[in-house]
């Protein structure tokens, strides 16, 4: 799932880039299609960004576990980050089906 999300994230960035180009807006149909595609991907990409933030927080907290002075804070942060990752992963599983057909 994460590999598919990375691919969709790249696609989303490409769409954003294309929509920033004035030539795209010269073709109203193309601009509308890209805008629709961006709107469909936006909720999934927002959830993916939250997941990545939680993942990075967990990674940072794991590094701090070896520091005796930071151990308690690191455990708490790690627990919160992992919980956030689990919640967001469930949200991603639910929402990814609306973007990627089950056969993929």
Where are the predicted features?
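Charged, heptad-repeat coiled-coil alpha-helices that serve as long linker/dimerization "arms"
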Residues: 1-104
């Amino acid at each position: 799932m994460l590999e598919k999300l990375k691919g969709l994230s790249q696609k989303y960035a490409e769409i954003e880039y294309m929509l920033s180009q004035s030539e795209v807006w010269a073709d109203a149909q193309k601009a509308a299609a890209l805008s629709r595609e961006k709107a469909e991907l936006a909720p999934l990409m927002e959830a993916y960004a939250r997941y990545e933030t939680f993942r990075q927080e967990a990674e940072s907290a794991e590094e701090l576990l070896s520091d005796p002075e930071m151990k308690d804070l690191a455990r708490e942060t790690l627990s919160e980050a992992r919980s956030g990752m689990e919640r967001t992963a469930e949200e991603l599983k639910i929402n990814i089906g609306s973007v990627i057909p089950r056969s993929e």
